[in-house]
Amino acid sequence: MPFTPVALPKNQQDLDQLTPTDWQTVIASTPHGAVQWMQHCAELGSANAQSILGQWLLDGHGTERDAKKAFAWFLKAATQGYVIGMNMAGRCFENAWGTEADPFVAANWYRQAAHKGLDAGMYNYANLLAAGKGVAQNHAHALEWYRRAADLGHAKSMTKIGHYYEDGVVVPKDTNAAFFAFGEGARGGDFRGQFNFAGMLAERGQMDEALAWLRKVPQNATPRYRLQAGQKLLRSAHPAFRTIGQQMLDSLPPDLND
C-alpha cells in the first residue's frame, strides 16, 4: 500500500474515528496513494469514500478513467442513503456514465437527494422538471427547487432564477429581479450568471463593470459555452464585447471551433 499521511483504517470503528481533516489530508496527498487508501475505505463500506472514489474514477484522478466502476461505487453510496452518492448516481443515469441512460431513474435519485437537503440534487432535479425529462414538465415546481438550492448558496440555481424573471415564466417578467438573481449567480462563481449579468450591466450603461464580469467567464466556462458565448458576443454592438468574443473563440480547441 503506497504511503498516505493518514493511517489505513482496519475496521468500521477506525472509519468512524476519521475526522474531516483526515479526509482532506488524504485527498490532498499523492493521487495514486490517495486512490489506494480511498478504495480500501470504500471496500470497508464508507459511503463517503465510495463517492470520492467514484468521482476520481470518473475524472481519471490518480487512476485510469472507468465510468462503469465509478457508477458502481456511486450506486453503493446511494443505496446507503448518502446524498452525494444519490446525486452522482442520478448524473450517471442522466448522462449514460457507466450505465444506460434512464431519465426516470435519474429523476428518482435527484429527488431523493433534493429531499435530503443537497443543493446540487435540488438543482439537478429542477433541471429535469424544467425540461420534462424523466418527470412531467412543471416549471412552477422547478422554480421552487431552484429557490431552495439558491437559499443554500447554489450559484447555478441563482442564475436559473434570473432566467425565469427575465423570460416571465411562471412569474411576472421582472428585469430588476433578473438583474439581482444574475448578480448573485455571478458573484457565486457561475459563468452563465457572469455572462448574463454582464449583458444586463451593459444595458444599464455600466460598461466597465460589464467588461470586468465578462472577462471572468472564460476562466471557468466549458469550451462549448465559450463557443456559444463567443459567437453571441461577435454580434454585439459593443466593440469591446466583440473583442472578448473573438478571444473566447481563439482559445477554443480546434475541433470545437471548426
Task: Tell me the role of every PLM-derived stretch.
Residues 3-6, 219-258:
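Terminal, low-structured helical/coil segments at or just beyond the last alpha-helical repeat
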